[in-house]
Amino acid sequence: MSNVFTHINADGNAHMVDVTEKAVTEREARAEAFIEMASTTLEMIMSGSHHKGDVFATARIAGIQAAKKTSDLIPLCHPLMLTKVEVDLEAQPEHNRVRITSLCKLSGKTGVEMEALTAASVAALTIYDMCKAVQKDMVISQVRLLEKRGGKSGHFKV
């Protein structure tokens, strides 16, 4: 792990990292997020009785769209040509929550960690948005990188 912030230059100013000379490699990142809610809210999602429609399908599409738009949201993030984005949602009724996992892949010069994190985050936010009419105190938590492969820094896994 490095002890240098790559997005801060010698003058202390934020800048986009120059990846021109970096090698193109296969890159992959996985992330997760959780959204906790009342059992009644989760049951509405699981039974398909939510008045706004299929919450998981909408959250999945939102997460995929968000991964593709990450560079528009994170100021110093490079625009990337993603080759795969996967968002999975798992109801965990024993914990009154939904686990969201994301996977992003590409062949490129920079990693896809931010895309994976953005996908999981926006999927969780979409669940919140769709369910806020029935519950406003849902909690989004534990947004984190699970695994990253490729590039100079190598393999990272929680």
Curated annotation (Swiss-Prot):
Q: Name one Pfam family in it.
A: MoaC
Q: Which UniProt keywords apply?
A: Lyase, Molybdenum cofactor biosynthesis
Q: What is its EC number?
A: 4.6.1.17
| Single GO term (MF) | cyclic pyranopterin monophosphate synthase activity
Active site at 129
Q: Give binding positions for substrate.
A: 76-78, 114-115
For this entry, list what GO says about its biological process: Mo-molybdopterin cofactor biosynthetic process
Q: Which Gene3D superfamilies match?
A: Molybdopterin cofactor biosynthesis C (MoaC) domain
Describe the reaction catalysed, as an equation: (8S)-3',8-cyclo-7,8-dihydroguanosine 5'-triphosphate = cyclic pyranopterin phosphate + diphosphate
Q: What class of enzyme is it?
A: lyase
Query: Pathway it belongs to?
Result: Cofactor biosynthesis; molybdopterin biosynthesis
Under the heading CDD domains, the entry gives: MoaC_PE
Q: What does this protein do?
A: Catalyzes the conversion of (8S)-3',8-cyclo-7,8-dihydroguanosine 5'-triphosphate to cyclic pyranopterin monophosphate (cPMP).
Subunit field text? Homohexamer; trimer of dimers.
Give the record's family classification: Belongs to the MoaC family.
The name this protein carries in UniProt is Cyclic pyranopterin monophosphate synthase
> To which species is this protein native?
Shewanella baltica (strain OS155 / ATCC BAA-1091)
